Amino acid sequence: MEPATVLSIAIGSILLVITGFAIYTAFGPPSAQLSDPFEDHED
């Protein structure tokens, strides 16, 4: 394959992995450890 094709596939794969990990962190089991700054601060 051409180097440009391999590079495009590699960059696309990396972006998909980063997006999947971000969604897992935001909505999966690790989200229980995230704090909400609006709930922590009381007026």
Swiss-Prot record:
An example Gene Ontology CC term for this record: plasma membrane-derived thylakoid membrane
Pfam family membership, one: PsbN
Location of this chain's protein in the cell: Cellular thylakoid membrane
Alphabetic keyword roster: Membrane, Thylakoid, Transmembrane, Transmembrane helix
Topological type in the membrane: Single-pass membrane protein
Transmembrane stretches, start-end: 7-27
Keyword Mitochondrion: no
GO biological processes: photosynthesis
PANTHER family hit by this protein: PROTEIN PSBN (PTHR35326:SF3)
NCBIfam families in UniProt: PRK13183.1
Family to which this protein belongs: Belongs to the PsbN family.
Job of this protein: May play a role in photosystem I and II biogenesis.
Protein name, as recorded: Protein PsbN
Gene that this sequence comes from: psbN
